[in-house]
Amino acid sequence: MRQSAGTLLYRGDLEHLEVLLVHPSGAYNRRAPWSIPKGEPGDETDLEETARRETLEETGVAAGPLISLGDIVYKKSRKRVHCYAGPAPLDMEPKCASWEVDQARFVPLAEARTLLHPDQCAFLDRLVEHLQNL
């Protein structure tokens, strides 16, 4: 089974929570859902390192401390996606740092639920649950 790893970086408190999402580039993806910044493992075997690398490559944001939100399996493609969450660095604004994405921005949680790939919405729920338990 193919797999990828990415991050769900956030800022704000539970009432004003925003998460960092990216939109894939290209005419074929014009109406595609948004995603967490993610990618497939390269030479590294550590999935958290893959998530960090892909986030930096796609958004220009270097992730700080991360916790695992587990994984999901896409219903159609059966691809496994591992997600790591952490607070976004306060002084960093995302940018499209890769040809793979045409937008990278923080979006409010409610909006993220409408933009995000439906299978990835479970990561939003897991993030909220984690933050409620802090």
Language-model region placement:
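Short, charged/polar surface micro-motifs in flexible loops or helix N-caps
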Residues: D13-H16, A27-N29, G42-D43, S77, ...
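Active-site-adjacent beta-strand/loop module that shapes the phosphate/pyrophosphate-binding cleft
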Residues: R2, I72-S98, Q103-R105, L127
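Residue-level detector of conserved, well-ordered beta-strand and adjacent loop positions
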Residues: V22-H23, P37, G70, A85
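N-terminal strand-loop-strand
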Residues: M1-I36
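Structured beta->alpha junctions
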Residues: G26, E40, I72-V73, L116
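Charged phosphate-binding loop/patch that engages nucleotide di/tri-phosphates or the phosphate backbone
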Residues: L116-L134
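The catalytic Nudix box helix
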Residues: I36-L69
